[in-house]
Amino acid sequence: MATPLSADKLLKALRDEGLHVVEHRSWRTNNRNHKGPWGPTHGVMIHHTVTSGTASSVELCYNGHSALPGPLCHGVIAKDGTVHLVGNGRANHAGLGDDDVLRAVIAEKALPPDNEANTDGNRYFYGFECVNLGDGKDPWPAAQLLAIERAAAAVCRAHGWGERSVIGHLEWQPGKVDPRGFTMNSMRTRIGKRLDGSPDGPSQPPPKPTYEPFPGSSFFAVGRSSPVVTAMGKRLVAEGCGRYTVGPGPAWSTADRNSYAAWQRKLGYTGTDADGIPGKTSWDRLKVPNV
């Protein structure tokens, strides 16, 4: 049983473990505390996102979607090992799970089969979503697995927990398969070895890129709201391609698509290659400032 870490303490714990951490938007106040209790905390739960692409995955986990409001976890672990903090407090990640599993986590004993869904896991578990399609084919880079190990160990170290306080979603709720592609027993072994030693200490963050990396074509869809879209729109206006009546703004719109199509035509694209949906080459040439 433990009082949840404050935003500052969580951030410090992760960085002290050697992780590169990005604070995403207003993560410190992004939570579901108005829908239910947060704490006491008992463990860490690992998930996969069933998505690809860092930027779109982070936005999804921050905002959630119509069927499941965000945040969908506390941190998103990217393929390159970067941890993007998206929530602080209760998050929609664990759902209902097995009370026998919770008792085993608290006692730090071997887990029983998860055959019931009768206990609110969002109250008791920190959640990390890891960017992976979850199809058993999408690879888990070494940097990402190391970051999962470090992130889970960081929270455990801050609370004085052992590796048995870390579980996968598939060990909590019947029918879940995540994380798929590595075993939780192997990950717990890694976490246990790490906890036997001292934390790695703060890492030097890589330099922030000058321009926004291409977030993938699927990022540009109806319902998307992101400061990246605003920054893109401002660059389109600067290039003489703005087709806005009002804006640019954060919500992806028909005006954004028409403006981007004008940019594609300016670059010499025609037909379906100038449909207004960004591609990597045209995006890189637009040089959208980092936000």
Q: Model-flagged regions — what are they?
A:
Residues 248-250, 273-276:
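Acidic, glycine-anchored loop motifs typical of Ca2+
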